[in-house]
């Protein structure tokens, strides 16, 4: 069953009845060319291993990449396997740059857990930059974590966060 449509409709159907959204592509299209060049977007593949596109992801072998995401990126975001049905995210591993964007489709009953995890990530970024790099602290302070009308939890912690957030929200609603 695939539902495809144009125009506005009530969101009375469950998220699972809708066609699967390409969260990686939505993040890619919502952010700057520079971010696409330098920051990989990772997600979980059909086989349960993590995969990534863009940024420096091509420099990794598949297993290496999956391990890096599992051991470094996912703990940063605080997301555990049982908290989501689908996601795509991108975070900077550099300590001198605040950067994190994510779209997470929470597992049933886990929306608040996802919001709390992503809020904790943002607070951690704010705390680490508060007395370190003022420009990065400003970026972290403008970060947003919100549940959008389509049910996904979106985190935007980057330059021009309002624009990136609106781009993601618009693409998810399409």
What do the predicted segments below correspond to?
Residues 2-5:
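C-terminal motif of bacterial Sec signal peptides marking the signal peptidase cleavage site
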Residues 7-10:
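Bacterial signal peptide processing site
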Residues 18-74:
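Early exported N-terminus immediately downstream of N-terminal targeting peptides
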Residues 20, 24-27, 101, 111, ...:
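Extracytoplasmic/secreted envelope proteins and their assembly/folding machinery
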Residues 31-35, 109, 119, 123, ...:
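Sec-exported extracytoplasmic/periplasmic mature domains
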Residues 49-99, 113-114, 141-143:
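Short, compositionally biased low-complexity segments enriched in polar/charged residues
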Residues 93-94, 103-105, 136-174:
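A short, solvent-exposed beta-edge/loop patch
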Residues 111-149:
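Short Gly/Thr-rich strand-loop-strand
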